Amino acid sequence: MEVPAKIQKRIERLRHEINDHNYRYYVLSQPTIPDSVYDELFHELEKLEKKYPETITPSSPTQRVGAEPLKVFEPVHHEIPMLSLDNVFDEKGLRAFDKRIRQRLKLDKPFEYVCEPKMDGVALSLLYENGELIRAATRGDGYTGENVTQNTRTIASVPLQLRGNDYPELVEIRGEVLMPREGFAKFNREAEKRGDKTFANPRNAASGSLRQLDPRITAKRPLIFYGYLIGLLKGKDFPKNHCDVLKWFKDWGIPVISEIKVVGGIEGCLDYYEHLVKTREKMPFDIDGIVIKVNSLQVQAELGFVSRAPRWAIAYKFPAQEKMTVVKAIEFQVGRTGAVTPVARLEPVSVSGVTVSNATLHNFDELYRKDVRVGDTVIVRRAGDVIPEVVGPILAKRPKKAKLIKIPSRCPVCHAEVIKPEGEAVARCVGGLYCRAQLRESIKHFSSRRALDIEGLGDKLVELFIQEKLIKDITGIYQLKKSAITALPRMGEKSAENLLTAIEKSKKTTLPRFLYALGIRGVGDTTARTLARHFHELDLLMKASIETLQEIRDIGPVAAENIHAFFHQKNNAELINKLIHLGVHWPQEKAVVKSEIAGKTFVLTGALKSLTREEAEEKIERSGGKATSSVSKNTDYVIVGENPGSKYEKAKALGISLIDEEAFLKLLKS
């Protein structure tokens, strides 16, 4: 049926008016019509689109709701990792952050920072192509998140189409999804009346709402989105400053939190912090601190990143909320590396909306310094508003029979000896990979993606294998039989075959991956590559003295001692030999010959045709180079694949050498 021109014009007019009212309500906080009038406009548009379905477009305001439930969330790879921020908890830490930046930039005078509230919600990435929302993804582990596009489309403050026409060809807008306090209280009241599950706090409510498999449920939750950062950007140059990015957001219809302020120097940041400490309760949603960012994007690019956080930003957390309760018992947990940690079992108490019944005492030095005993009345707080910890006892309330806790002489799990080296705060079980507590975590680590990458061997299955005594040590992974696996609940023939295929595939690995998989304390994937590159053979590494290990660049005395102790423990040596006997193998690491890659730092952006990102990084490391995830002035080359991200733009701005895949492969052969 042909749509009359008059009707088409009215539909377009209604869409424009509704989008404009959304913009005024969510971005400008200046609504110009009552809700009832807005509802009338929306219902009129719905009726017209129902009568003329050929007029419906994906970006129409009516298309926020109505998608069918999903079976599972698809994974999304973040081209630019969604990194978290480092935290500081006092003025001293904040001043140290400022000092590090100025020293790195060789600046004496203060420079501009942008201060903003640290929203206590869920990080979200919005991808817009030619102004239209095409994908929304959660942070996940920072590298891989979940596709929550259908759910995000139901959030009224997220524009399905950016305003105006001055937006780039492709832009990734990062921000936070929140549930305002008022909406949270109302939701819990109504859920309680229905006898449904309630949420402990607004953050849990926002996270649970965003990850509903049925978008129609998300649509009923009072969620709001605020943008705070650009990830990918194509078809437009970055502006000069971060505050200019926020102005872009407002122009495009992306809500930006109003309490953002540009300040001169660290003193301005401290003033902003003090102001927000006093006014945080007046805000419509929960915040747990402030975020401080260098305003200049050029300076941000120069500073770059360290590990999993940017150097140019920091989170200054508010003092944690505190409550009193009683210590019922002090028990001991054993971690993957054998650390024996005292944990207080508490009379349950609500702190910041979360019921706390366990709290860490960190280590035995902390336990004795605080002098916490069973029976004590203690102050409990959520450190950084997240992790429960015991601040200390109230001595005036201490009962006469309060018991002082001693370091256990034996591991509570495997009964091996527990030792506490002089000068160290942590006591450790020496049972190694034979300790059941360490075994559970060690298998999870051993089979993880960056280690031997055994697909399908998840946490629950590991627990089940240990519980059923199918795996008694880490070598048991390679001795699993199909008949034993299929006898387990919910494990059919196909599942068993897939798992055994993945286990067999994992036998062929690399020396760096194998070293990382062993879970040696202090040996991450970077240190594992360093060790493999230096020794080339496992036997040489296992025989190395502490002095030899300390001669290697980036291996300090503590790491050297841990590596030496691990390989000189009889149980571990036997386990390694057994793994090799069971077929775990790798190509011998070749000594690095002089090449154009040796000593150079590389960053990859975009997809390569002939190699995965991990394969390319491994080849760089084997050739004596270094692969990093972010561009800085210390980067030598940026390898540009298909559909490069903003790393490409940053590299151009810093004058860093750009090479394509063909040039990179030639360098590898050099």
Swiss-Prot record:
Keyword DNA repair: yes
InterPro entries: BRCT_dom (IPR001357), BRCT_dom_sf (IPR036420), DisA/LigA_HHH (IPR041663), DNA_ligase (IPR001679), DNA_ligase_AS (IPR018239), DNA_ligase_CS (IPR033136), DNAligase_adenylation (IPR013839), DNAligase_N (IPR013840)
Positions with a binding annotation for NAD(+): 35-39, 84-85, 116, 139, 176, 293, 317
Chain positions recorded as Zn(2+) binding sites: 411, 414, 429, 435
Domain BRCT span(s) in chain numbering: 592-670
Keyword DNA damage: yes
CDD domains referenced in this protein's UniProt entry, alphabetically: BRCT_DNA_ligase_like, LIGANc
Enzyme class, broadest EC rank: ligase
GO cellular component: cytosol
Gene3D superfamilies: 5' to 3' exonuclease, C-terminal subdomain, 6.20.10.30, BRCT domain, DNA ligase/mRNA capping enzyme, Helix hairpin bin, Nucleic acid-binding proteins
Key words, A-Z: DNA damage, DNA repair, DNA replication, Ligase, Magnesium, Manganese, Metal-binding, NAD, Zinc
Co-factor(s): Mg(2+); Mn(2+)
Residue numbers annotated as active site: 118 (n6-amp-lysine intermediate)
Catalysed transformations (reactions): NAD(+) + (deoxyribonucleotide)n-3'-hydroxyl + 5'-phospho-(deoxyribonucleotide)m = (deoxyribonucleotide)n+m + AMP + beta-nicotinamide D-nucleotide
Domain of life, source organism: Bacteria
One of the GO BP terms on file: DNA repair
Enzyme Commission number: 6.5.1.2
GO MF term list: DNA binding; DNA ligase (NAD+) activity; metal ion binding
Reported function: DNA ligase that catalyzes the formation of phosphodiester linkages between 5'-phosphoryl and 3'-hydroxyl groups in double-stranded DNA using NAD as a coenzyme and as the energy source for the reaction. It is essential for DNA replication and repair of damaged DNA.
Family per record: Belongs to the NAD-dependent DNA ligase family. LigA subfamily.
HAMAP family given in the database record: DNA_ligase_A
UniProt-recorded name of the protein: DNA ligase
Organism: Coxiella burnetii (strain RSA 331 / Henzerling II)
Gene designation: ligA
